[in-house]
Amino acid sequence: AAFIRMEPEFNPPMSGSNSICVATVLLDAGIIEMVEPVTNFTLEAPGGLIKVKAECSNGKANRIYIKNLPSFSNALDSVLEIEGYGAMNVDTAFGGDSFVVVDADSLGFRLSPDEAKDLAKLGEKITQAANEQLNFYHPTYSDWDHFSFCHFCGPLLGGKKGKNFKSAVAIKPGKIDRSP
């Protein structure tokens, strides 16, 4: 099965949250045969193939896991000038789409729901500044030459089940996405 995610300005090569939604609909609607307790299949997005593993029971997809497109860092420790904030160090990366990656702690964010409006506003400024001041390069998709989103990352924490961190992704127009 294939899908295309359409945006007002561009059509992203891949979307993690939309891949999860598409996989759920394909299974729950019976478009793809469900095998309980686990169904494996492949989705095709404009950027490439996405492996899907779905945990299923009672005719419903309960949990979806995806293997994203190959990811890479584009640049580390780049300096951006942001109006009202001054100079800021950022990384840039590709993980199904192009991101400006920012240390939320260094900007005073805890990544809590009450900060969503401020994160969305600043994220738009950061993404715009990156598109004006930095270059994005994808080795396969040469026409993908812009930054789509700002990914605010919290500190990496260790736990019994591995490492994790809080994050928030600012998307247009001034919103926070549910997944990076």
Spans of model-derived segments:
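Active-site proximal loop and beta-alpha junction motif in alpha/beta enzyme cores
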Residues: A1-M14, S19-P180
